[in-house]
Amino acid sequence: MAVERTFSMIKPDATRRNLTGAITKMLEDAGLRVIASKRVWMSQREAEKFYAVHKERAFFSELVELMSSGPTIVQVLEGENAIAKNREVMGATNPEDAQEGTIRKVHALSIGENSVHGSDSAETAKTEIAFWFSEVEIVG
């Protein structure tokens, strides 16, 4: 097994409900270690750029609005197979489809307000980490 780094985000719908600690605990209990973390309030421009891959999708405007509606916690996680493990702990995008005990099953309000975002591949993780963090901010 390989030690990897991945990007994780606690979305505004979760920070508004003071779930930062509970969600981080679920990630840490799964063996992931937070090696960088900061609280940001994403501008509309940042949200558009970060989620540019979804620009042509019907939900893009709603996503940008949600992501710029309040504070977000951006994190770098490290651990064995961190990318897959983070996605497993997050659960399916639609909380109705998520397995019991996952972040989205426990905390999500809807498919849009689903509490968390996580990288889906090593390449995406690298890009998303670099979007929010400089190398000196990541302390492994």
Curated annotation (Swiss-Prot):
Subunit structure: Homotetramer.
Gene3D superfamilies assigned: Nucleoside diphosphate kinase-like domain (3.30.70.141)
Positions that bind ATP: K11, F59, R87, T93, R104, N114
Record-given protein name: Nucleoside diphosphate kinase
Residues annotated as catalytic: H117
Pfam families: NDK
Coiled coil regions in record: none
Key words of the record: ATP-binding, Cytoplasm, Kinase, Magnesium, Metal-binding, Nucleotide metabolism, Nucleotide-binding, Phosphoprotein, Transferase
GO molecular function: ATP binding; metal ion binding; nucleoside diphosphate kinase activity
Principal cellular location given in the protein's record: cytoplasm
Presence of keyword DNA-binding: no
InterPro entries linked to this entry: NDK-like_dom, NDK-like_dom_sf, Nucleoside_diP_kinase
SUPFAM superfamilies, A to Z: Nucleoside diphosphate kinase, NDK (SSF54919)
Family the UniProt entry places it in: Belongs to the NDK family.
